[in-house]
Design a protein with these regions (language model features):
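Conserved active-site segments centered on acidic
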Residues: 2-89, 158-169, 174
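Helix N-cap/beta->alpha junction signal
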Residues: 23, 97-98
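Phosphate-binding/catalytic loops
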Residues: 92, 98-174
């Protein structure tokens, strides 16, 4: 668990290549699911990319549109690059594919390797190991990525709900 201000939260960081498609969609989906479950205050959620070519830019237009059609607002997010400090700060650093996981192992302190996981590991029913990059593809590619992302975020939230509920019980009333 990570200390953010006065509260302890569960830190989740979603990782893709440029932080303009998959990882911001995952951030938006998870935030929305946690909010609907009444657990948002238990989480610190962010996303980043392994590549720095789009830093400061908003998500891809089709990523914004696909997410919005399912009720997830990601329009205000901006791309950033992951750094070693992120791996220290976040409890779960979730890679959208095996290449990202390998990249993260180059920058992560060895003692924190257990924080690095494939995102799809949270959806045991998924046949996908990687969330395919929809960038440059048609809307259907973004929808397919979102199907995997929503299922993975649902599994992640279910896995972390007992811990999140415990954290919320321990936090002082506002």
């Amino acid at each position: 668990m990570t200390a953010w201000g006065w509260a302890m939260t569960i830190g989740i960081l979603f990782i893709c290549t440029s932080n303009i498609c998959r990882s911001p969609m995952a951030e938006g989906v998870f935030r929305n699911m946690a909010r609907r479950a009444g657990l948002a205050a238990a989480f610190t959620v962010d996303s980043a990319g392994t590549f720095d070519g789009y830093v400061g830019r908003p998500p891809a237009p089709l990523a914004i549109k696909a997410a919005a059609l399912r009720g997830h607002d990601i329009a205000g997010l901006r791309a950033r690059q992951v750094g070693e400090g992120d791996i220290v700060r976040f409890d779960y650093v979730l890679a959208m594919d095996r290449c990202h996981l390998a990249d993260l192992r180059w920058i992560a302190p060895r003692a924190l390797f257990e924080r690095l996981q494939l995102f799809t590991s949270f959806d045991p029913s998924s046949r996908a190991v990687d969330v395919a990059d929809p960038y440059g593809g048609p809307m259907g590619d973004y929808e397919q990525a979102l199907d995997i992302i929503e299922a993975g975020c649902d599994g992640l939230l279910k896995a972390l709900t007992p811990l999140a509920e415990g954290l919320l019980r321990e936090q002082p009333a506002a």
